[in-house]
Amino acid sequence: MKADIHPAYHTIKVVMTDGTEYETRSTWGSEGAVMNLEIDPKSHPAWTGGNQQLMDRGGRVSKFNKRFGGLGL
């Protein structure tokens, strides 16, 4: 097996949309980094039955609707 080809694992903190936090090991970020989730199993329509609206934090949905809303598909 080749040496030094595998990514380093380290501990990060994950913050869910409701504010709950937990620590896990990941290759994402660096040691002690914080990952803030915009969508998680508690807020995703696939797991909540589709009744909850997605939050448009990045403005991507509104930008898409503004650009292509008049097509009337």
Swiss-Prot record:
Gene Ontology BP term (one): translation
Pfam families (alphabetical): Ribosomal_L31 (PF01197)
GO MF term set: rRNA binding; structural constituent of ribosome
CC annotations in GO: ribonucleoprotein complex; ribosome
Subunit structure, interactors included: Part of the 50S ribosomal subunit.
HAMAP family: Ribosomal_bL31_1
Official protein name in the record: Large ribosomal subunit protein bL31
Organism: Agrobacterium fabrum (strain C58 / ATCC 33970)
Gene field: rpmE
